[in-house]
Amino acid sequence: ASLAILKREGQTDVDVSVGELRDEDGFTPDVLQAQILHGFSHGITLYGGMQAAENYGSAALGVGKDLGALGAISFDVTHARANFSHDDTETGQSYRFLYSKRFDDTDTSLRLVGYRYSTEGYYTLNEWASRRNSPEDFWETGNRRSRVEGTLTQSLGRDYGNLYLTLSRQQYWHTDDVERLMQFGYSSSWKRLSWNVSWSYSNTARQGTGNNHASDNTSEQIYMLSLSVPLSGWWGNSYATYSVSQNDNSGS
């Protein structure tokens, strides 16, 4: 989940990184990422960013506003250009709205109520890599059209961790499938050791589109435990993360 994007007045953050995008099938294009945020008066933040690979590029521009007791909002637009072959280049835009609010009386946070709408030609970096490397798998869903997500976090006190609940719904271009996700979890820490336990349930409603495509529902439950352990000595602030999960699948 993401918070509405804000910076204090006069503060500027710049982040630049270079690395490889690691696809599960071994596709590893070099990627450059950069972003900048600056806080202005009256609770306004302007921000922008970019991603670039050999055949992919995107640029984003957005604005955030502190609403005081009402919370905070931000809105941004991303333009992307994705090349798949000499005569197949897609361009499109994505529009995102974020809202966050903290309720001090109950120590509850509404971390995100966001809506993202993408035009048909818009591809994220991961979607571009997936289509280039595994087109048959990619076209089982295609690129994402819209997503709505909300996360509610309840603090149990300084020493007792947090409970959280996330709900989301998303749809894709070129299919009428609807994916829904519910995740409930608990996270806590002790000194530099942290852990998270979660249960998630996802459901995909597939709509039939002709004689060879039957409507069905596929659901999946995932139980996960993750543990983050600090590495002492010369490793400085490095951490080792361990996780274990169990999947239960069903279809109808």
Located regions from the model:
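Conserved, compact domain cores that house catalytic/ligand-binding motifs in diverse enzymes
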Residues: 12-81
